[in-house]
Every structure is written in structure tokens, then in C-alpha cells.
Regions:
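N-terminal secretory targeting modules
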Residues: 6, 10-13, 19, 28-207, ...
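Conserved SGNH/GDSL esterase-like catalytic core that processes O-acyl groups on lipids
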Residues: 50, 193, 202-206, 211-303, ...
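Extracellular glycan-modifying ectodomains
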Residues: 137-152, 264-270, 284-286, 324
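Surface-exposed amphipathic alpha-helices with a cationic face
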Residues: 302-310
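Actinobacteria-biased recognition of intrinsically disordered, low-complexity terminal regions
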Residues: 1-4
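Catalytic His-Asp segment of secreted/periplasmic serine-dependent ester chemistry enzymes
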Residues: 287, 322-394
Length: 394
């Protein structure tokens, strides 16, 4: 990576205090969802404040497979960055504190009517209309919704689906309880992002698996490691959590979604105002059948992500693979693959910077295990304290 200039939006050294945004160059999109003729909205630059990655439904996912008719879905979601204009914001941004919602159905087979929709009880419009047709495979963005929200605020999104929708793209578990009508759900259907005015900050996207998604941390506590990083980033970059449980970097899976290489364009490059990619995948390539036992293949996949991210002028932070002794599929042979991958990553030639998750989480008495106070109980997934250790290592 020597000689390659990247926009670094996270300052400092590993374990140090994070710096602010460096520079003002952005690679985001303008508000394509703005009401026609609304020049003010069209000039706003947006940044992803909350995001999730979608998968296709399987036979085990009854709601996503059957879809909905005459149903209201409700979600309470934690934003990383708010809409409150910072000191020195331009007049346009000060005049238009707002959010924008993004919906997508990449795995759908038929058009879906979405709406009416509200955000914190305020109507969400689409080109001035109360609903929108979301074509199969398409993405739509809403008009700006005027809301003043601090960093770390919760946004309540209510979405009516007249249906019948047919099967829907969704995220299986966002570790926050919403509702389908009068019953609870941890799944989010169709909604993929919540954007806020960029106000000089860029987005950190985390491409990960169940550890990033939040398995091992309590629901509704917002203590996943990207959440805890976002809390440290106040008035700095926004954080988009693109973790999918079971996800790999190499292989696609019917239940656990397209692998990191396959979903890179849609999930990562689809984010507005992106500046940095954190890639934290690999443990499922090793431990999940069919196990990848050649470290070179995993490293090659990482290299491909780096090449593609650099093509879009993104800084890339790569994570070592954490310990998993005690997990149901642990073997010493698989752990050697993990250590071989980590040894190459620590040489510092692959990524722009390294997030040493392994060093942050391992038991000093047995490097193959999680520290006891970081173990959620299954040997693989860190608890909230372990998630904090990852956040502090960035």
C-alpha cells in the first residue's frame, strides 16, 4: 500500500484518541429522493447514519417468505450521527436539519407498494406522494423529513405495506425489537438506511459477520462494537453496521447471505458519503462447513476487497480474526489457519491500517480463547465488554 494516498477519516494510532475528519472531499451522492423541483433538498449532501445489509428469505423465515398484506411494521433504530448542525455549518445545512430513508428489495420478485411511512410520527413522502412503488431489485429514497436529532438519537420508523407483497428482502436480526402489527420482531424488512446531512463528516462502513451484527450483546442496548465506536465518534464520522450473522468473505450462502466479495458493491458502495471501510470477516470461512483451510485463499479475498475499495478512494482497515476455542466447531487445525491469516495481516502490507481484534480479545493465558470476561458464553462471540474492547482497539 505504500505510495497510495487514502482519505483517512479516523485519526490517531491503535488504542489512541480518534481524530476528526481530515479534509472535505466526499464521494457521496446528492439527494436523489428529493421532491422534484426542490433545489434546496437536491443540493444537500447526505451521509449514512444507520444502515443494514439484507439477505434473501429462506423457508425458515416465515414472515419474509410469505410477505405482508395490510400490515404496519415499526422499528426503533439508533442513529450514529444526528441532524443537529455543527458549529460552522453552511446556511443550507442549518436551514434543513433532516433525515432521509432508503428502501431496497434486491431479492424481491415483484413490485411492492411502500407507504404511508412516518419517522418519529412525521410523514415521509416520496416525490411529494405518501407512498412509492419499490420495484423488484430496486432502491428508493424518500424526500427529506425535517427533524432535529442529536448524535446517538433513536428514530422510530413506521411503515405500512398494503400488499400482498410477496417475499421480501430483509435483515434477520438487528438486535432491536420492532413490531409486525401487534407482535414483536427483531427483523427489519425493506428499510436499508437512514441518512442525515453530511455536515463535513464521512461514513465508516463495517463489513462483518455475527460479531459485528451484535450476537453476544444484549438486544436493545446498542452495545455492539460499531455502536460503541459510534459513541466515541460524536461529531466525527457516522458508522454503518453491515454485519450479517454467518457471513463469509469468500462464499455465498442461502441463509447467511452473499459473501463479502459478492455484496461489496451493493452494501458498501451504495452508502452515501463513504470514506472508510472496515472489513471484519473470515472466521466463518474457517469454522463453517465447508471450511476454508488455505490461508492464501482468505488473504486473496481480502486483497480483492482492498483493490475494489481503493478504486473508490476508500481507506481500508482490516481486522484480525479473533479467538474461538470453546466454540462448537473449534479444532486446533482450524485455529492454525486463523493464526496463519493473522500473522500475514500483522505484517502490515495488505490493509491501510490494522484493527487487531485477536490481540484485543484473547486470553493472556491461552491465546486460542477469548478472555473470560469478554466471552458471551459460546467461545466465539464477545459480550458487550468484549465489543467495547474491539471499539477501543480501532
Amino acid at each position: 500500500m505504500s505510495g497510495v494516498s487514502r482519505r483517512s477519516i479516523l485519526g490517531g494510532t491503535a488504542g489512541g484518541v480518534l481524530g476528526g475528519v481530515v479534509g472535505s472531499s466526499v464521494s457521496g451522492t446528492s439527494s436523489a429522493g428529493a421532491t422534484a423541483g426542490n433545489a434546496t433538498a437536491a443540493r444537500l449532501r447526505w451521509a449514512a447514519s444507520w444502515a443494514t445489509a439484507q439477505t434473501a428469505p429462506t423457508a425458515a423465515d416465515a414472515d419474509a417468505t410469505s410477505g405482508f398484506t395490510d400490515t404496519t411494521l415499526r422499528y426503533k433504530l439508533r442513529l450514529s450521527a444526528g441532524t443537529t448542525p455543527p458549529a460552522g455549518a453552511d446556511a443550507l445545512t442549518r436551514a434543513r436539519p433532516a433525515v432521509r430513508l432508503r428502501f431496497a428489495n434486491p431479492f424481491g420478485a415483484a413490485p411492492v407498494v411502500v407507504g404511508p411511512v412516518t419517522a418519529n410520527a412525521k410523514p415521509v413522502l416520496f416525490g411529494g406522494a405518501k407512498d412509492v412503488v419499490l420495484a423488484a431489485g430496486a432502491t428508493v429514497v424518500s424526500d427529506p423529513v425535517g427533524l432535529i436529532l442529536p448524535d446517538g438519537a433513536d428514530l422510530v420508523v413506521s411503515m405500512y405495506l398494503p400488499g400482498p407483497t410477496g417475499p421480501l428482502s430483509f435483515h434477520r436480526n438487528v438486535h432491536a425489537t420492532g413490531s409486525i402489527g401487534d407482535r414483536a420482531t427483531n427483523s427489519v424488512f425493506l428499510l436499508t438506511g437512514i441518512d442525515v446531512p453530511a455536515t463535513g463528516r464521512q461514513v465508516v462502513a463495517v463489513l462483518g459477520d455475527s460479531i459485528t451484527e451484535g450476537v453476544g450483546t444484549p438486544d436493545n442496548a446498542n452495545l455492539r462494537w460499531p455502536d460503541q465506536d459510534a459513541a466515541r465518534f460524536r461529531r466525527r464520522p457516522a458508522v454503518a453496521n453491515l454485519g450479517i450473522s454467518g457471513n463469509r468473505v469468500l462464499l455465498d450462502d442461502g441463509r447467511f447471505g452473499p459473501g463479502g466479495q459478492s455484496r461489496f458493491d451493493r452494501d458498501v458502495l451504495g452508502l452515501p458519503n463513504l470514506g472508510t471501510l472496515v472489513t471484519f470477516l473470515g472466521i466463518n470461512d474457517i469454522q463453517q462447513p465447508p471450511s476454508q483451510t488455505d490461508p492464501a485463499r482468505i488473504l486473496q479475498a481480502y486483497q480483492q476487497l482492498v483493490h475494489r475499495a481503493h478504486d473508490h478512494d476508500l481507506e481500508v482497515i482490516g481486522a484480525t480474526i479473533g479467538p474461538f476455542k470453546g466454540w462448537i466447531r473449534y479444532t486446533d487445525a482450524l485455529d492454525r489457519v486463523r493464526n496463519d491469516v493473522n500473522a500475514v495481516l500483522r505484517q502490515g502490507r495488505l490493509f491501510d491500517r490494522l484493527l487487531d481484534v485477536d490481540a484485543a480479545l484473547r486470553d493472556p493465558a491461552d491465546h486460542a480463547r477469548l478472555r473470560p470476561d469478554f466471552n458471551s458464553g459460546d467461545g466465539l462471540h464477545p459480550n458487550a465488554a468484549g465489543a467495547k474492547a474491539i471499539a477501543l482497539a480501532l
